[in-house]
């Protein structure tokens, strides 16, 4: 007698009947796998993490969305001359959506895991991103609140010294425009602001930045720059002080005051005449009426430095 279980037709029916169960199991379970080499998820052109949408040529060479606009419809793959049009690589996009990796700031306290395609955007906004010391000759890095304590201990004598009081909402300081980097600090909230002057062929660019991660939950500040000489005035106002993780020498693309050469006394700027005023205001309303948070910067004696350090890092 022929075993009914061995009949090919019955076997086919049995396999088909198991498919709904398998589908149900996959819907009810979260399956995971370990990817040993994350480099396979990087764009072969810019070597940055692939982002959605991802495009491919007919041979399967892929390119990220940003590089796609730069390759002029030509596949960047080695030895490949096929056109790369609007053909999406949905298989890779699905991998990017499902591949979660921990933030690189895990060791500093971040507990978030994000999809691989969003790693770059998350780490730019992560509260635990590491900041660099605003002193250009120092390589120290740490969280933004640690950087404040480091700066006050190591570099206070190099900064623009300004006084501060709790409950006030604005800061007014005078800074010589010939200084490339001036650091303003406020002890109660442990804030570091950097005023930079970039001398270029046609004049000087002046910016104000705050040492802090660019996360939205940090308090916002507005600012006003003004420059006066021989009756001529240049002013610039911005509703928000941009945040940065590291001071650099790159000429700003936006949010700056420009002082043309016609208002400068040549390359060597006269300290007595060419002074700019910086006003920084906090967006949050304080309980006390807004007055000057910082007084105009004044020379500080050596015996005052240690007291200032002690009070500021308590």
UniProtKB/Swiss-Prot annotation:
This is E3 ubiquitin-protein ligase SINA-like 11. It comes from the Eukaryota. A zinc finger (SIAH-type) spans 98-156. GO terms for biological process: protein ubiquitination. It comes from Arabidopsis thaliana (Mouse-ear cress). Residues 1-31 are annotated as: Disordered. Keywords: Metal-binding, Transferase, Ubl conjugation pathway, Zinc, Zinc-finger. Belongs to the SINA (Seven in absentia) family. Zn(2+) 2 binds at residues 133, 138, 150, 155. GO terms for molecular function: transferase activity; zinc ion binding. E3 ubiquitin-protein ligase that mediates ubiquitination and subsequent proteasomal degradation of target proteins. E3 ubiquitin ligases accept ubiquitin from an E2 ubiquitin-conjugating enzyme in the form of a thioester and then directly transfers the ubiquitin to targeted substrates. It probably triggers the ubiquitin-mediated degradation of different substrates. It is an enzyme of class 2 (transferase). Residues 13-23 have a biased composition (Basic residues). Zn(2+) 1 binds at residues 103, 110, 122, 126. Pathway: Protein modification; protein ubiquitination. CDD domains: RING-HC_SIAHs. The RING-type zinc finger domain is essential for ubiquitin ligase activity. The SBD domain (substrate-binding domain) mediates the homodimerization and the interaction with substrate proteins. It is related to the TRAF family. It catalyses: S-ubiquitinyl-[E2 ubiquitin-conjugating enzyme]-L-cysteine + [acceptor protein]-L-lysine = [E2 ubiquitin-conjugating enzyme]-L-cysteine + N(6)-ubiquitinyl-[acceptor protein]-L-lysine. Its EC number is 2.3.2.27. Residues 95-280 are annotated as: SBD. The keyword Zinc applies. A zinc finger (RING-type) spans 43-81.
């Amino acid at each position: 007698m022929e075993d009914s279980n061995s009949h090919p037709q019955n076997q086919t029916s049995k396999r088909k009947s198991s498919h709904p169960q398998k589908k149900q199991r996959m819907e009810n379970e979260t399956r995971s796998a370990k990817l040993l080499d994350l480099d396979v998820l990087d764009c072969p052109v810019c070597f940055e993490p692939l982002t959605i949408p991802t495009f491919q040529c007919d041979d399967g060479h892929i390119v990220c969305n940003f590089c796609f606009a730069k390759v002029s419809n030509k596949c960047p793959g080695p030895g490949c001359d096929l056109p790369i049009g609007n053909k999406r690589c949905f298989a890779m996009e699905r991998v990017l959506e499902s591949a979660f990796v921990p933030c690189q700031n895990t060791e500093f306290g971040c507990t978030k895991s994000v999809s691989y395609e969003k790693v770059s955007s998350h780490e730019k906004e992560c509260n635990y991103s590491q900041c660099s010391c605003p002193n250009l000759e120092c390589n120290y890095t740490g969280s933004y609140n640690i950087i404040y304590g480091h700066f006050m201990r190591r570099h206070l004598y190099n900064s623009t010294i300004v006084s501060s009081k709790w409950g006030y909402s604005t800061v007014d300081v005078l800074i010589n425009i010939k200084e490339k980097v001036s650091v303003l600090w406020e002890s109660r909230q442990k804030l570091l602001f950097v005023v930079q002057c970039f001398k270029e062929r046609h004049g000087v660019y002046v910016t104000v930045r705050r040492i802090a991660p660019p996360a939205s939950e940090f308090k916002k500040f507005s600012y006003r720059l003004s420059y006066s000489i021989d009756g001529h005035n240049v002013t610039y106002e911005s509703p928000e002080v941009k945040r940065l993780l590291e001071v650099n020498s790159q000429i700003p693309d936006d949010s700056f005051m420009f002082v043309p050469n016609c208002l400068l006394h040549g390359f060597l700027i006269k300290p007595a005449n060419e002074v700019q005023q910086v006003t920084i205001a906090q967006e949050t309303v304080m309980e006390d009426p807004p007055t000057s948070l910082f007084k105009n910067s004044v020379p500080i004696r050596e015996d005052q430095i240690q007291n200032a350090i002690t009070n500021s890092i308590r």
